Amino acid sequence: SPTQPFPTKPPPFEYQGVSIDDLVDFTPEIRAMAVEAVKDFRLGPLFSPPMLSVDGGLQGTIQRPYVGGGASWTGAAVDPETGLLYVPSMNRFSVLKYYTPDPADGGNLRYTMRGLAAGTQPRMPQGLPLLKPPYTRITAIDLNEGEHAWMQPNGDGNRYRNHPLLRDLDLPPLGGEGHGGPVLTKTLLISALSAGGTDDGPRLVARDKATSVHDAGWSGILYYLFTPLVLRIYDSELVLFVLIRPNFQRNQRSGPRFAQQK
């Protein structure tokens, strides 16, 4: 192929590439901060290559989705009866660059890659986001038609909404934080936010899987960070139990937690 193949169906479930129009614009002042933050980086569409980082020049290519992907390794959920695939995803970026190594370090490579997980990054003041929201979302993809059935932010994103520069703004749901894969019941799509240490997580969230409408009766606070939802069980009284596999961290109480709903 003369070019990198670009899929045409289904549409992307997450942002691809970064342009100046993708920078956050909650207020003119915050927009100016974002423009300043990326002045030493190359912006471009999906598949923009890494670049040589030199002193006094550009410091790398901003890539989106980031190297961990738009979707997470915990995967999606599929309904074989309706043909809908439910994909949670994250709106994040990485900086890709390479540099000329110091000959004194040994080796015979002309260039060395860096910036995959760390290195120079565009930094916003006071922990503000660099890009426009949502920062996490869930997309229902109709596999029969190759189209989106619905797409919704996953959570309100209070970590940003409660920021001193943002708390007085009338912002839409921004999306929380979460790497967990969803599970399905006959009517519900259950997912979770693993935003430990933030104002709106961790939380268990349920939606009507056909319409994306949030089921407030199923939302609840979780005590631990976790990766995926790993099991669902129905008992004789039709009580739904969801077992959470926690990721324990220092200073957290031990033991699993269970969510249930009649």
Identify the meaning behind each predicted range:
Residues 130, 248-249:
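Generic hydrophobic alpha-helical membrane-segment signal
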Residues 233-248:
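Short, strongly patterned local motifs
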Residues 1-232, 236:
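Beta-sheet-rich non-transmembrane sensory/scaffold domains
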Residues 256-261:
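Short, intrinsically disordered C-terminal tails of secreted or membrane-associated proteins
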